Amino acid sequence: MIPAERQKLLLNLINQKDVVSITQLAESLNVSHMTIRRDIQKLEEMGKVVSISGGVKMQEHLSFEPTYQDKSLLFHTQKEQIGKFAAQQIPTNTTIYLDAGTTTLEIAYRLIERDDLLVVTNDFSIAHFLMTNGQCELIHIGGTVNKLNHSSVGELAGQFLRQLSIDIAFVSTSSWTLKGLTTPDENKLPVKKALLDAANQRILVSDSSKYGKVATFHICPLTRFDRIICDKNLVEPVQHAIKELTVELITV
């Protein structure tokens, strides 16, 4: 059986269940585990499936952005670990961008003693926290208010960002795969694209639960990032594939 035919059968098998193990797939098609893993890697690169611990599942479509409140309740320990590590990597006398999100808020929590930083953000919760507790200089970029996500979005926000030169951008997302970042909210595109252009170094900060989800609007390929900081639950095949893209991956 040629690979294309086998991969089509794999998709049919995976589509019938929520999660299928490598062993189940190998037995169903009477091929080796190694053959199945190669096929899965190919299907994942095509954006069809997602590797998870112990198996594989169909890629999940994200149709709407979770609210800020909902995000704050999910995977808190992983976000804390990512935020702590990311904050420790920030050099002195740096201009950084903290993208809107609960993971980047964890970075902000660890910057209250830093009086050598200029922090730029589109997140109202981050701005309020640093304005109240921090010693850094602070810029909120303004723009159209997204109340559910406590952030500013749209072309006005993007225009402001295009006037800046940022040393390090810490970028958040609700959906990413090996093909890159996506969003269900078209209004986020101007901000995301402008901050990626404005930054000298781009770091994606995301817990592993966001991996494998895809939304309607494409933001950028994964190769736009210099580094990805994620938790250790990101499965090994995905970690290996990211490193093959020559993007530095750090799991904490």
Predicted regions: what they are:
Residues 104:
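Conserved SAM/SAH-binding loop
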Residues 2-5, 9-11, 15-23, 27-29, ...:
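HTH-adjacent hinge/linker in prokaryotic transcriptional regulators
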Residues 2-5, 9-14, 18-24, 30-32, ...:
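Conserved phosphate- and dinucleotide-binding cores of soluble alpha/beta proteins
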